């Protein structure tokens, strides 16, 4: 797929990525475990830090592989992993997804979680009546963009040391501290 190839093009690398994957994987399923033969995976057992090609065939293994492949080309890139919002249905698939992303962020460098599951309003029936029409409507996407901007700003302000040299990511002018 050309879009996937473009993602890993060494001439198209970015300083940061927002990754929001998993929603389509969960459609029609009770939880992530249904899709991965009962195993969402675990960062400690399913991520091979030395060779991402050896990651386990689980949600965690595949998700981490995307990050690790980019990190191999651009080691200081920042990643913002987006959890699914809580739909207020009591279905624990969103919580399973959020837990998996927190594990990945804790295990890999330069990864942070935009936790819509715990920190955004519930995307319940009332919310959906205002901000959805099948998929999100324009107001829903605008509101979500504001969540992302606010959350990323919060992450940066609470991790200033990690972000002080982002302007040099991808350049040959890497400060000694990033070396």
Residue ranges of each PLM-predicted region?
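Short intrinsically disordered, low-complexity coil segments enriched in acidic
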Residues: 1-7, 78-79, 113-115, 128-131
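Conserved SGNH/GDSL esterase-like catalytic core that processes O-acyl groups on lipids
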Residues: 1-53, 57, 61
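Surface-exposed acidic, glycine-flexible loop patches that form ligand/cofactor-binding
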Residues: 2-13, 70-73, 154, 158, ...
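A general structural detector for well-ordered alpha-helical segments in enzyme core domains, enriched
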Residues: 3, 59-66, 97-101, 144
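Structural recognition of the beta-strand scaffold that forms the well-ordered cores
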Residues: 15-21, 25, 78-83, 112-115
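Active-site segments of SGNH/GDSL-like serine hydrolases
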Residues: 23-24, 64-98
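Structural alpha-beta junctions
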Residues: 57-61, 69-78, 106-112
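Catalytic His-Asp segment of secreted/periplasmic serine-dependent ester chemistry enzymes
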Residues: 84-179
């Amino acid at each position: 797929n050309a879009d996937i190839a473009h993602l890993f093009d060494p001439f198209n690398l970015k300083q940061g990525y927002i990754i929001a994957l998993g929603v389509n994987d969960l459609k029609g399923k009770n939880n992530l475990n249904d899709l991965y033969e009962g195993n969402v995976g675990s960062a400690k057992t399913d991520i091979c830090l030395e060779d991402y090609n050896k990651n386990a065939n689980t949600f965690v293994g595949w998700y981490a592989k995307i990050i690790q492949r980019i990190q191999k080309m651009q080691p200081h890139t920042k990643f913002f992993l987006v959890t699914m919002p809580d739909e207020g249905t009591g279905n624990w698939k969103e919580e399973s997804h959020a837990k998996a992303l927190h594990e990945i962020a804790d295990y890999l460098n330069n990864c942070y979680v935009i936790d819509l599951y715990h920190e955004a309003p519930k995307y319940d029936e009332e919310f959906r009546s205002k901000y959805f029409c099948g998929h999100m409507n324009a107001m829903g996407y605008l509101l979500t963009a504001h969540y992302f901007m606010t959350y990323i700003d919060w992450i940066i302000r609470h991790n200033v040391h990690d972000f002080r040299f982002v302007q040099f990511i991808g350049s040959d002018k890497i400060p000694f501290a990033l070396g």
